[in-house]
Structures are given as C-alpha cells and as structure tokens.
Amino acid sequence: MPLNLPRHLPAIEILKRESIFVMDDLRASAQDIRPLKIVLLNLMPVKIATETDFVRLLSDSPLQVNVVFVKMKEHQSKNTSLEHLMAFYKNFEDICEENYDGMIITGAPLELMNFEEVTYWEELQKIFDWASKHVTSTLYICWAAQAGLYHFYGIPKYSLAKKMFGVFQHTTNGSNVPLFRGFDSEFYVPHSRYTEIRKEDILKVPRLKLLVESKESGVHIVSARCGREIFMTGHAEYAPNTLHNEYQRDLDKGIQTEIPKNYYKDNDSTKDVLVSWVAHANLLFKNWLNYYVYQATPYDPKEIEFLEDLNVKE
C-alpha cells in the first residue's frame, strides 16, 4: 500500500531498505484519489520502533493511506525525543473534529496497574468514546485491547502467575470471517504480557464475539459491532527480533524471565529466531484494511459518525 507519511519520518528509510514502498506527503499530494485516513495512537515508550512495525504492515496495496500519528497530551515521553514528537505527532485535540476510516491503538507497558491509576486514563477514555463514533474500524492492541474491553464492556483483566512470553499457536472460531480470509487452520502470534482476559467473561457479553484463541495463550481476538471494534491481545505487528530484545532487556535488568516459547531454533537463545507469524500478520492487516476499512467506510468521511455496526459478516 502506498503509504503517505511525513517527510523525514525515520520509518521511511528503514522500510525502503526492506524494499517496502512508501511515499512522502509531497508525492502523495499529486495523486487525485480519496486516500484512506488512518490514525495511529502510539502508547509505546519507544515510538519509532512501533511506528515502523505498523507502517510495515499497512504497506503493499494499491490503495493510498494517509497515516496520522497521535500521542497522549497528558504523558511526557522519556524514551522518544521531543524533536521527534514535535515533528511527527499530533495531540488528540488536533484531530478530534475529523472522522477517520481506521484507527490503531497500540499497547503500553502498564498491565499491572489498575486502569484508573494510569495518569492519562481520562484522556484515553475520551479517545475511546470518540473512536466509537468517528472511526469506521478501530484495532485495539494488547494493553489497549484490555483497556478498551474494560471501558466499553466491563471485562476485567487478571494477573498471570508468570509472563506470557513467546509465539503461540492459534485457531479461529469462524472460517468465514473476512478478517481471516486466506488463513491456514492454525497460525502463530507473538505474546508478551503479564495479564490476561478470560474466555468466560467474553462469552457473558452478547455483543462480543470471540474470534481467535489459543490453548496456551488464551483469548487473542475479540470483535464488537461487526468489526467496528477489534481487540487483539497479541502482537502480530512484532518485528522478528522484538521478543529477543525484550528478553535481553529483562535479563539486563535482573528479571528472571523464561526464554520466549517457540521462538528460537531448538529453544536456544544463542540460535536464530524462527519467524513463524509474519505471513499471517501481513494477511491480517490486509484483510482489515480491505474488508473493515476500505469496503466499509463511506466515501464521504462526514457519514462515518452515522454508522452503527459494520455490514461485515462474522
């Protein structure tokens, strides 16, 4: 997908080296088409890596996508320079008067805190409520999925006895769901978290549909409003070395984290990473953009706020 990104965004050069086509805003402005407008609310501390992960997955389609990066106003980043944030990010108040075709809300390393203890919880709730009316389809990732399910549907999260860490096998609960068109019957997804949401709580809420789960890592994808809200507890967007970097970081901090499961060849951290999730991750995001964004969004963005559920069969 030709992505319209701000000139000089670090992800552009990284992805060009991977032979992924992106265009800057100067070239994109010369194309006389209605681009899809996607918001990326980046809650992660190291923002450049997260930007690159998601931009990589939003690429490789004939449609043009304008990506707008948004940060929390009530949080001061310690791991991303102010210069980068000033150059490439907006605050919520800068975009709240517009409608968008799609939105991605990333995870955040806040799992062991109560939601109400998060310094920007009130601001985040306002963004959740805004997205439910002003965005055609929103992906909530990892902690954001837990936060969104709690905010909208009262679903609690539970602490795990140990970190869910590795790449786990998953199956879908509906072969005809457009989000999984072209998927194999079993596929792998990385997880890295200390908390979980539980199947029995999801099944108590009629408006929620459990789409993907794993025998080992539990609930992965839950849908609401026929795909206007999609909650994903795993990290399909992770680059090959992300879990390795997290593992080394934990060891450097003296945290006795177990080796990520199903990740290294022969489960040996001195050997190569076995990349088993990237093909399905790319297909997942292509399907989301096609069936839940491009085919579902009105041509006139003003009509987005009048949508109820999407007309997507699940």
Swiss-Prot record:
<feature type="binding site">
    <location>
        <position position="163"/>
    </location>
    <ligand>
        <name>substrate</name>
    </ligand>
</feature>
<comment type="function">
    <text>Transfers an acetyl group from acetyl-CoA to L-homoserine, forming acetyl-L-homoserine.</text>
</comment>
<comment type="pathway">
    <text>Amino-acid biosynthesis; L-methionine biosynthesis via de novo pathway; O-acetyl-L-homoserine from L-homoserine: step 1/1.</text>
</comment>
<dbReference type="GO" id="GO:0004414">
    <property type="term" value="F:homoserine O-acetyltransferase activity"/>
</dbReference>
<dbReference type="InterPro" id="IPR033752">
    <property type="entry name" value="MetA_family"/>
</dbReference>
<feature type="binding site">
    <location>
        <position position="249"/>
    </location>
    <ligand>
        <name>substrate</name>
    </ligand>
</feature>
<keyword id="KW-0012">Acyltransferase</keyword>
<comment type="similarity">
    <text>Belongs to the MetA family.</text>
</comment>
<dbReference type="GO" id="GO:0008899">
    <property type="term" value="F:homoserine O-succinyltransferase activity"/>
</dbReference>
<keyword id="KW-0808">Transferase</keyword>
<feature type="active site" description="Acyl-thioester intermediate">
    <location>
        <position position="142"/>
    </location>
</feature>
<feature type="active site" description="Proton acceptor">
    <location>
        <position position="235"/>
    </location>
</feature>
<dbReference type="InterPro" id="IPR005697">
    <property type="entry name" value="HST_MetA"/>
</dbReference>
<feature type="site" description="Important for acyl-CoA specificity">
    <location>
        <position position="111"/>
    </location>
</feature>
<dbReference type="GO" id="GO:0019281">
    <property type="term" value="P:L-methionine biosynthetic process from homoserine via O-succinyl-L-homoserine and cystathionine"/>
</dbReference>
<dbReference type="GO" id="GO:0005737">
    <property type="term" value="C:cytoplasm"/>
</dbReference>
<dbReference type="Pfam" id="PF04204">
    <property type="entry name" value="HTS"/>
</dbReference>
<keyword id="KW-0028">Amino-acid biosynthesis</keyword>
<protein>
    <recommendedName>
        <fullName>Homoserine O-acetyltransferase</fullName>
        <ecNumber>2.3.1.31</ecNumber>
    </recommendedName>
</protein>
<feature type="site" description="Important for substrate specificity">
    <location>
        <position position="192"/>
    </location>
</feature>
<feature type="binding site">
    <location>
        <position position="192"/>
    </location>
    <ligand>
        <name>substrate</name>
    </ligand>
</feature>
<keyword id="KW-0486">Methionine biosynthesis</keyword>
<dbReference type="InterPro" id="IPR029062">
    <property type="entry name" value="Class_I_gatase-like"/>
</dbReference>
<feature type="active site">
    <location>
        <position position="237"/>
    </location>
</feature>
<keyword id="KW-0963">Cytoplasm</keyword>
